[in-house]
């Protein structure tokens, strides 16, 4: 974008704050209503499940990790793109991240909050959740550190804590701008959230130092958290799971699906609120390149899984992967391959990388494909283990599908509320970019 096309830095405050200050549209109210309805029906399902038991969730031998665990892994993965954009690209000084990092950070926090529900849902007895916390107690019981469920508790809570702190610290200067441009109860709330920010040089030094340290802390978390989640499976001897490739495979898939979800969220927001001057085609094209890159990594991992199963000569592994492609779950497997590997290859063409409707549709299907990837990994391996007499056919129950739908509504509810409560674009960072671009006459 040329400097002449850039808005004035003062205009950036007006444009971005207008998303918050303008009245709520009927479209926003409709979407929020649908999201609340979805959350309500999922809550009703969970209440009934808690009363009756996990039997209504379709759990039956040999599949006792099902849609709830699939969806947990999916949402944890979605949360990784925000940290990648905000932390890793910040450390690499990639300026194009400035316009999209806030949306990505918000998505990260809300995705992790969604994922955190599923270990609790999976244990069935919600009121016993504190048994997962290692603390001295009169019962003489201690947590089982060999349990993948406990690994997930530590991974999710660590990642959620860092993500929320990182998200909030970045919002402080923008809360101060919102404080000075609103009145009434909104001004009161923003005043509290701004923590006395006045934009003094000392505050900026402390803020920049904090963001830098949090970025350095969050970067290894991107790699470690989903690696820990992948070890839920890789540490077992179940055919199709016991593989050393799982950690990098899961991390690449998480970034891939996370970037696709950022696009699905950002493209409508950009269009509806007229933010094309800030979230430009240049940003979307750069994200498309990341999606293409991580898609190819996932494709390589898929191919290597099948190759190693063949090369190993282990009959159980070969049978497991044969059944994935041609067994009762073949539709899920081929949806995964087509949506995650074949369709993204169209991004080699620049015309398609800059075609906004195409990007939205593609990223929507990528997220479907990434959910199917987790479904294929978990369900197919558990339903066809070592003993043929113990094989079974798993079919998701209505209760699981209800909670799955509710998780997307839960995520959407948070994001819609944030649209009207917090700046969806980091105003301070965008203004820095505008000033820098006008001074140097270069694209960002």
Which residue stretches match the model-derived regions?
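Transmembrane alpha-helix boundary signature
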Residues: 46-49, 119-131, 172
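TerminUS-proximal long segments
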Residues: 2-10, 340-344, 350-444
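Long, contiguous internal "core" modules enriched in hydrophobic/ aromatic residues
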Residues: 19-21, 26-48, 137-336, 349, ...
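N-terminal signal-anchor module of multipass membrane proteins
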Residues: 1-78, 412-416, 443-444
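Membrane helical hairpin/interfacial module
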Residues: 63-127
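Transmembrane alpha-helical segments in integral membrane proteins
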Residues: 81-93, 159-176, 261-271, 341-357, ...
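Hydrophobic alpha-helical transmembrane segments
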Residues: 73-78, 146-164, 254, 330-341, ...
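Interfacial and helix-entry/exit segments of alpha-helical transmembrane bundles
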Residues: 103-110, 276-299, 358-369, 431-439
């Amino acid at each position: 974008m040329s400097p002449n096309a850039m808005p004035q830095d003062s205009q950036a405050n007006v444009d971005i704050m207008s998303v918050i200050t303008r009245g709520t549209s009927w479209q926003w109210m409709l979407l929020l209503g649908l999201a609340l309805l979805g959350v309500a029906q999922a809550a009703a399902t969970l209440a009934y499940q808690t009363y009756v038991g996990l039997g209504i969730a379709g759990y039956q031998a040999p599949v006792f990790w099902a849609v709830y665990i699939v969806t947990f892994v999916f949402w944890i993965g979605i949360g990784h793109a925000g940290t990648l954009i905000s932390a890793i690209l910040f450390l690499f000084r990639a300026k194009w991240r400035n316009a999209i990092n806030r949306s990505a950070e918000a998505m990260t926090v809300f995705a992790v909050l969604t994922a955190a529900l599923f270990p609790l849902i999976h244990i069935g007895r919600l009121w016993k959740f504190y048994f997962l916390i290692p603390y001295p107690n009169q019962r003489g019981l201690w947590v089982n550190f060999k349990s993948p469920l406990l690994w997930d508790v530590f991974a999710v809570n660590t990642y959620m804590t860092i993500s929320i702190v990182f998200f909030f610290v970045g919002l402080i200067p923008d809360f101060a701008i919102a404080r000075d441009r609103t009145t009434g109860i909104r001004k009161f709330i923003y005043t509290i959230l701004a923590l006395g920010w006045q934009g003094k040089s000392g505050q900026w030094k402390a803020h920049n130092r904090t963001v830098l340290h949090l970025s350095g802390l969050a970067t290894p978390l991107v790699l470690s958290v989903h690696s820990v989640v992948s070890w839920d499976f890789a540490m077992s001897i179940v055919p199709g799971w016991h593989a050393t490739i799982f950690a990098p495979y899961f991390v690449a898939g998480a970034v891939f699906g996370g970037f696709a979800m950022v696009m699905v969220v950002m493209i409508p927001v950009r269009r509806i609120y007229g933010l094309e001057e800030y979230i430009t085609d240049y940003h979307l094209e750069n994200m498309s390149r990341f999606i293409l890159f991580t898609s190819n990594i996932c494709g390589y991992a898929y191919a290597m899984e099948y190759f190693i199963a063949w090369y190993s000569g282990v009959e159980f592994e070969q049978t497991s992967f044969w059944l994935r492609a041609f067994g009762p779950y073949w539709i899920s497997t081929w949806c995964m391959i087509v949506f995650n590997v074949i369709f993204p290859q169209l991004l080699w063409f620049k015309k398609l990388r800059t075609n906004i409707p195409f990007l939205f549709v593609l990223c929507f299907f990528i997220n479907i494909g990434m959910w199917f990837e987790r479904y294929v990994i978990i369900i197919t391996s558990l339903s066809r283990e070592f003993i043929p007499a113990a094989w079974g056919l798993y079919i998701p129950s209505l209760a699981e599908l209800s909670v799955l739908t509710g998780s997307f509504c839960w995520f959407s509810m948070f994001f819609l509320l944030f649209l009207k409560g917090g700046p969806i674009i980091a105003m301070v960072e965008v203004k820095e970019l505008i000033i820098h671009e006008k001074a140097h006459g270069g694209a960002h």
